[in-house]
């Protein structure tokens, strides 16, 4: 099967489509508190999924990285308002060192093509 890579930087692709599955690289936003960053990241996720043939209701799995687990409840309040009942993906959330000090959350997504 063909592998399609989109928006490559020489280091990574923002999206890869293979076997009717969309893989998104980690999405971040470096401004605001964890709620604001989560909102912006989820907007990016939704835009990329729509651009490459999927949407948030077709998300299969999500990996969420938080700089500090104290932000878990705040991040979840945004996530829970965004994801629709009945379309909850498999999900993991872990505390992680981030690439930049200003990053509080990073989300990677795997979704089915519509």
PLM regions and their residue ranges:
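N-terminal presequence-like segments and the immediate start of the first folded domain
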Residues: 1-60, 66-114
